[in-house]
Amino acid sequence: DGIVLAAIFIEDRKEGIIKISLRSKGNFSVNEMSRAHFEGGGHTNAAGGKSHLSLQKTIEKFISILPRYNKALNDE
């Protein structure tokens, strides 16, 4: 019930990138998050992006930016 944000990271070895799929509930904009941090975009509740970092570094980056969105995530 309390889940507002979901993320999937897919390693595309052929393209040499990490593909990121973001989903949210309510008014939390994964579009804004994706545009700001992962060269992507989409809709308020469904967006995608990419990273040229390794899978591990991409996940670390994602985790490191979450505190910036803490208030918005907790307001949902």
What label would you give each PLM region?
Residues 1-76:
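Gly/His-enriched, cation/cofactor- and phosphate-binding structural elements
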